[in-house]
């Protein structure tokens, strides 16, 4: 195959498509190669016998990244992708009794948690949200700043981030300090399964996974 494009991208998954969109907006000629018969990669949808199936994820998490990419090319991610916010995000039904409707209405979450397992856990949820807002903000600054060498790993910036990320703790041990009730620990930790990890082994950084759902919502 002969191509006269300035850039050749292999794979029409989310990363390849995002690169192509940004490059094309900048005036670069781009060609994308894809082995499948459609775009999307792991997020592709395919049809069989009149039904549509998700090739991978069944919902959309943390829209801010897509919003930034689409805004950079003068588009609206929610409009062009047809994102549908879910409310509630999902319902959790506990084997030990009780349920929660996970929602971005944080005060409603506090009220539900208080009814389910008391004020101590409700206050723990407030602390969890504030803690992870800080964790997310410092993580973003850290990831958006160049790391030029080994000395950066022991810089004031790195130590400040490490203090908040607490890499010496697991997700499970971090949550146990905020939620005495095991149902709440489960509600805020099962998201590590998205990454194929156990909350007992996943670094505490990944407490942000549930936080992103409560702060930014879940979309279909």
Protein language model annotation of sequence segments:
Residues 3-137:
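N-terminal glycine-rich phosphate/pyrophosphate-binding loop and immediately adjacent elements
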Residues 35-36, 204-207:
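Active-site-adjacent bridging/hinge elements
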Residues 48-52, 195-196, 217-220:
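A short glycine/serine-rich beta->alpha loop
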Residues 69, 202-205:
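A short mid-domain helix/strand-loop element embedded in enzyme catalytic domains
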Residues 71, 189, 207-210:
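Generic alpha-helical structural context detector
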Residues 77-78, 146-149, 208-211:
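Short, intrinsically disordered/low-complexity patches at protein termini
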Residues 95-203:
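Rossmann-like flavin
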Residues 208-220:
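Helical element adjacent to the flavin cofactor pocket in flavoenzyme catalytic cores
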């Amino acid at each position: 195959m002969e191509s006269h494009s300035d850039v050749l991208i292999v794979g029409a998954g989310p990363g390849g498509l995002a690169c192509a969109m940004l490059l094309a907006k900048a005036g670069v000629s781009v060609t994308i190669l894809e082995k499948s018969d459609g775009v999307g990669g792991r997020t592709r949808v395919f049809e069989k016998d009149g039904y549509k199936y998700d090739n991978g994820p069944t919902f959309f998490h943390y829209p801010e990244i897509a919003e930034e990419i689409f805004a950079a090319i003068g588009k609206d991610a929610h409009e062009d992708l047809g994102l549908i916010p879910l409310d509630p995000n999902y319902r959790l039904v506990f084997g030990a009794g009780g349920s929660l409707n996970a929602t971005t209405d944080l005060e409603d979450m506090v009220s539900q948690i208080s009814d389910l397992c008391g004020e101590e856990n409700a206050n723990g949820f407030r602390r969890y949200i504030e803690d992870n807002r800080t964790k997310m903000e410092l993580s973003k600054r850290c990831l958006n700043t160049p790391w030029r060498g080994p000395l950066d790993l022991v810089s004031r910036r790195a130590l400040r981030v490490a203090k908040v990320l607490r890499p010496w703790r697991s997700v499970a041990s971090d949550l146990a300090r905020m939620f005495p009730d095991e149902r709440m620990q489960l509600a805020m930790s099962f998201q590590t399964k998205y990454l194929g990890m156990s909350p007992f082994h996943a670094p505490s950084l990944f407490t942000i996974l549930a936080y992103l759902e409560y702060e930014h919502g879940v979309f279909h």
